[in-house]
């Protein structure tokens, strides 16, 4: 990691941009295209470090993936012709790759070992291993909780599973394993979590039924899979940094085009509207993965908010930068029910509070979230992403509230999801 990045950007921010393709959808598109025999094309994928780890693994399994002018051309021999890997499958910093492939490789019955970087080695895997073992997967981790994960051939069975947490990664691991079961699987969710796996199964011709909090699979659904082309919308989690940047920087007027606004992911839009932020959606498309252009303008006197319940999984990855936004409200805001933040790249409850407090903001971490007081940038302490891409970008946005440059250690963590983040932010500064 680069030791230090000096962020020296001032407002107003003005202009029109696009953000990189959605990370969650890119992962799933690569996985499904690789399972389907034939040729699939993925347009405008995210080619950050996380998604490249997923690509690398499927190449080892025998899939040809070519990068060609903002698209991936995936040519697969089909899942039945995958190679048995003779080396550890390295997932890097990608929790999505690790957890979803734990389910998929268990279902395939391919003897393999999944292992990631130091950060992944600290992230709990028991929440995925428990349901997979109920499905008779032969999968073991260190202390039944940590990578490396050792997978051996097994025959997967269907289960009726009540989710313990609102986690799209856990749900998706179960769904990918269930593709190979001779019995149906039923999943009951606590709250609605992002549903990209379900929508993309359908896109690749895999039958699945989802209604309310219940999901039902079809026995041996993998036999229905067909190759398909997929257009990846812009990642709302990446757009979130520009949404907040425009809202808190005087004189700003920013438009972001082609952003995915799947209702299971669009919590930040709901939150900004509740806070009275000046945000408008237009050019909306409908379908399984709807998109829109989003215009955001500087908004003083934002209203405080309590973020809890079903709103939390709809905005889970955006909560660090939303916490920054809440420091600019006229009263105290609260984030609750967000224990899931503890098992991200860092414990994002603690890292968000610690780093913003270093800069003079006033946040109190709680067991399941944050209490955020109206507060201002007071000191130019050196801060640290702690190798967490979303913390790094959140701190860069916070620097817009400072009249002096801000130093951020390990800033190149942002390459995990948004390799061109800083140049894009500077582009808006120059246009402003």
From Swiss-Prot:
Protein EC: 2.5.1.19
Residues given in the record as phosphoenolpyruvate binding sites: 23, 95, 123, 169, 348, 390
GO molecular function, one term: 3-phosphoshikimate 1-carboxyvinyltransferase activity
Catalytic activity line of the entry: 3-phosphoshikimate + phosphoenolpyruvate = 5-O-(1-carboxyvinyl)-3-phosphoshikimate + phosphate
Coiled coil (residue ranges): none
GO biological process, one term: aromatic amino acid family biosynthetic process
Top-level taxon of the source organism: Bacteria
Keyword Amino-acid biosynthesis: yes
Pathway the protein takes part in: Metabolic intermediate biosynthesis; chorismate biosynthesis; chorismate from D-erythrose 4-phosphate and phosphoenolpyruvate: step 6/7
Coarse class of the protein's main subcellular location: cytoplasm
Pfam families per UniProt: EPSP_synthase (PF00275)
Alphabetical keyword list: Amino-acid biosynthesis, Aromatic amino acid biosynthesis, Cytoplasm, Transferase
Cell location: Cytoplasm
InterPro entries per the UniProt record, alphabetical: Enolpyruvate_Tfrase_dom (IPR001986), Enolpyruvate_Tfrase_sf (IPR036968), EPSP_synthase (IPR006264), EPSP_synthase_CS (IPR023193), RNA3'P_cycl/enolpyr_Trfase_a/b (IPR013792)
Catalytic residues (positions): 317 (proton acceptor)
Binding locations of 3-phosphoshikimate: 23-24, 28, 167, 169, 317, 344
GO cellular component, one term: cytoplasm
Family under the similarity heading: Belongs to the EPSP synthase family.
Function: Catalyzes the transfer of the enolpyruvyl moiety of phosphoenolpyruvate (PEP) to the 5-hydroxyl of shikimate-3-phosphate (S3P) to produce enolpyruvyl shikimate-3-phosphate and inorganic phosphate.
Subunit relationships: Monomer.
Name of the protein this chain belongs to: 3-phosphoshikimate 1-carboxyvinyltransferase
Provenance organism: Staphylococcus aureus (strain NCTC 8325 / PS 47)
Lineage start: Bacteria, Bacillati, Bacillota, Bacilli, Bacillales
Gene that specifies this protein: aroA
């Amino acid at each position: 990691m680069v030791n230090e990045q000096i962020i020296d950007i001032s407002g107003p921010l003005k202009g029109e941009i696009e953000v990189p393709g959605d990370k969650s959808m890119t992962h799933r598109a690569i996985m499904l295209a690789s399972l389907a025999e034939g040729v699939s094309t993925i347009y405008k994928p995210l080619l950050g470090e996380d998604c490249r780890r997923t690509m690398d693994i499927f190449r080892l399994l025998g899939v040809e993936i070519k990068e060609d002018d903002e698209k991936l051309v995936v040519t697969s021999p089909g899942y039945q012709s995958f190679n048995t890997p003779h080396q550890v499958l390295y997932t890097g910093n990608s929790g999505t790759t690790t957890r979803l492939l734990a389910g998929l490789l268990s279902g395939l019955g391919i003897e393999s070992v999944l292992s990631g970087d130091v950060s992944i080695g600290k992230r709990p895997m028991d929440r995925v291993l428990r349901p997979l073992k109920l499905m008779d997967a032969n999968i073991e981790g260190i202390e039944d909780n940590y990578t490396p994960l050792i997978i051996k051939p097994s025959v997967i069975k269907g289960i009726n599973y009540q989710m313990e947490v609102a986690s799209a990664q856990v749900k998706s691991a179960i769904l990918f394993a269930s593709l190979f079961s001779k019995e149906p699987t039923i999943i009951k969710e606590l709250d609605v979590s992002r549903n990209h796996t379900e929508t993309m199964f359908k896109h690749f011709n895999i039958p699945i039924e989802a209604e309310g909090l219940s999901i039902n699979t079809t026995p041996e659904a993998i036999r229905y899979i067909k190759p398909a082309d997929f257009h990846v919308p812009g990642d709302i989690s990446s757009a979130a940094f520009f949404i907040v940047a425009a809202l808190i920087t005087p004189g700003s007027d920013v438009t972001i085009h082609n952003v995915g606004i799947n209702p299971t992911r669009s919590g930040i839009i709901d939150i900004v509207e509740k806070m009275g932020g000046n945000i408008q959606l237009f050019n909306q498309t409908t379908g399984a993965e709807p998109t829109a252009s989003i215009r955001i303008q500087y908004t003083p006197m934002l209203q405080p908010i309590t973020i809890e319940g079903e709103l939390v999984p709809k905005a889970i990855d955006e909560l660090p930068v939303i916490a920054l936004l809440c420091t600019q409200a006229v009263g105290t805001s609260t984030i609750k029910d967000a224990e899931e933040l503890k098992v991200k790249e860092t414990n994002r409850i603690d890292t968000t509070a610690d780093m913003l407090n270093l800069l003079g903001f006033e946040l109190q971490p709680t067991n399941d979230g944050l209490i955020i007081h109206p507060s201002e940038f007071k000191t130019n302490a050196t801060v640290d992403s702690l190798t967490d891409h979303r913390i790094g970008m959140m701190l860069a946005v916070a620097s817009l509230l400072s009249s002096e440059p801000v130093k951020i250690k390990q800033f190149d963590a942002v390459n995990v999801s948004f390799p061109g983040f800083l140049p894009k932010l500077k582009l808006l500064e120059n246009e402003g």
